[in-house]
Amino acid sequence: NINEISKEDFVHKEIWFSHYIHHKIINKTDDNPVIVVSRNNILTDSINQFMTTQDFDFKKAMHVYFIDEAALDVGGVYREWFSCLFKAFFNKDAHMFQALNFSGLGRNTIFISEDAPEDKEGIEKFNLFGKLLAKAILDKFTLKQNLNRFLIKSIIKKDITLEDMQYYDLE
């Protein structure tokens, strides 16, 4: 029962969540999505694969292959793809995210770029980013970048407080 688990400590909540998610994930191997990308064009290739595949099921295990590389994906290639893909999403040349430097708070965080695309294609990229972020969480993949607290609370639809604003604008 969700009400009962909400009263538990964090460790028990995490165990419950992990157990719950693993029972929800489809583990079929015959029709799992296959992603084929070039390392040099990982963001565009990945976006194109997701946008051209109808009904992409993010609950299924994905198999990833890098073009011109002989490697069997038993998990390592998939995790490397995630790492490289998020690095590409967060690269300033992608115009999606920017680093906010809060030396007074002792950390750098990632927030939506001021020059992020607002057209249909840009919105689709952010939509895909959200799905991949959810997939990364489901698969227990740790991001090397810290998302901004203001952004996280917006994503999970939590109320933004005045204290949260310091993570967006120190002034």
Report the location of each language-model feature.
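Long, Ser/Thr/Pro/Gly-rich and/or acidic low-complexity regions in intracellular
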Residues: 1-171
